[in-house]
């Protein structure tokens, strides 16, 4: 070493234990954290939070005297199904897509038909990876002739956006399509339950008709709320009840949450978190994160009927592999205890 010398000296100049670099876990100090627009309000309500895809989301809202999370979640579910509940769903990925060829583009990335979605309508779509496995699901609404807005699951927001960019830039660069992620630019709330329309009618400006006849199931549109604030309204349901999702620019998010809760007092409105959201989507039979784990096909999830046989799309060929069409593959099913007093614990093994 003395004869040959060394390369340019760089720190560390003497051996350092790897543990000095890694250190012990420092909690969330080195993690970026995103808060939803209703975070401040939720903290004021004593919400319990959970980290989901680098977001902090309200898990449930305990009331004084509730000592177990199930008490809070059961109350939130029951009140939502009986009257109305509000959930912050801002964390869902949101992608604005514009251009003359957006319909054709969406028709190539979703398994179901998107070529003729009418203006003012929303359609639920399923997206596959190239290997035929389910990548993500979500809704896409057509706000105008050449303007669509897509929603994705919270966990896959970045992956889906990256996938769409790859498809456009590498596979179909000639299509007139332009997209941008607006996940953090819009605050979005689910308003669900039998009284959801009555609550929204107190917030939506009077020149916007959201009656059942004017705004039917799966409708979408740009409206105004609270005296002229631009908003987007979607009549979609993650819970099985009459429900809407309303989106405003993020800077209005906190105010809108407070306004919705105040407007819903006469209906005994309840805020609900991710646990209640999960309960209601299971009761509805809606597939979500635990099922979209990268190892399931559309047929495994009972969604084979959505697949169009009249077009090609990403994952179509490999989705028809013999192994994916076996009759003995695991299928998503729902369980209900014979004795309603028996609890099915999460993570239990079926023998």
Where are these regions (language model features)?
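Conserved short loop/turn motifs at secondary-structure junctions
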Residues: 91-98, 127, 146-147, 183-190
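Short amphipathic beta-strand starts and helix->beta connectors
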Residues: 75-82, 127-137, 173-175, 225-233
């Amino acid at each position: 070493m003395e004869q040959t010398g060394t390369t340019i000296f760089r720190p560390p100049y003497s051996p350092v234990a790897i543990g000095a670099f890694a250190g012990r876990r420092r909690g969330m100090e080195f993690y970026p954290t995103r808060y939803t627009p209703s975070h401040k309000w939720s903290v004021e309500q004593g919400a319990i939070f959970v980290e989901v895809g680098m977001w902090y989301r309200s898990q449930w809202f305990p009331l004084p005297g509730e000592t177990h999370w199930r008490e809070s979640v059961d109350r939130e579910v029951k009140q939502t199904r009986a009257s109305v509940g509000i959930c912050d769903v801002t964390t869902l990925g949101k992608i604005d897509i514009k251009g003359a060829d957006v319909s054709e583009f969406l028709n190539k990335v979703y398994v179901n038909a998107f070529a003729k979605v009418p203006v003012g309508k929303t359609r639920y779509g399923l997206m596959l990876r190239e290997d035929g496995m389910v990548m993500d699901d979500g809704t896409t609404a057509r706000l105008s002739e050449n303007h669509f807005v897509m929603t994705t699951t919270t966990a896959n927001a970045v992956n889906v956006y990256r996938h769409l960019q790859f498809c456009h830039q590498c596979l179909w660069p000639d299509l007139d399509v332009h997209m941008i992620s607006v996940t953090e630019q819009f605050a979005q709330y689910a308003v669900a339950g039998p009284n959801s329309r009555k609550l929204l009618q107190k917030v939506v400006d009077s020149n916007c008709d959201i009656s059942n006849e004017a705004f039917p199931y799966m409708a979408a549109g740009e409206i105004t709320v609270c005296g002229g604030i631009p908003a987007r309204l979607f009549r979609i349901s993650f819970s099985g009840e009459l429900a809407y999702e309303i989106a405003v620019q993020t800077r209005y998010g906190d105010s809108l949450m407070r306004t919705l809760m105040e407007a819903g007092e006469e209906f005994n409105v309840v805020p609900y978190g991710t646990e209640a959201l999960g309960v209601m989507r299971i009761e509805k039979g809606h597939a979500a994160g635990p099922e979209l784990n990268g190892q399931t096909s559309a047929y495994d999830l009972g969604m084979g009927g959505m697949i169009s046989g009249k077009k090609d799309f990403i994952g179509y060929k490999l989705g028809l592999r013999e192994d994916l069409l076996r009759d003995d593959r695991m299928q998503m099913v729902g369980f209900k205890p014979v004795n309603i007093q028996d609890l099915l614990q999460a993570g239990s093994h079926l023998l």
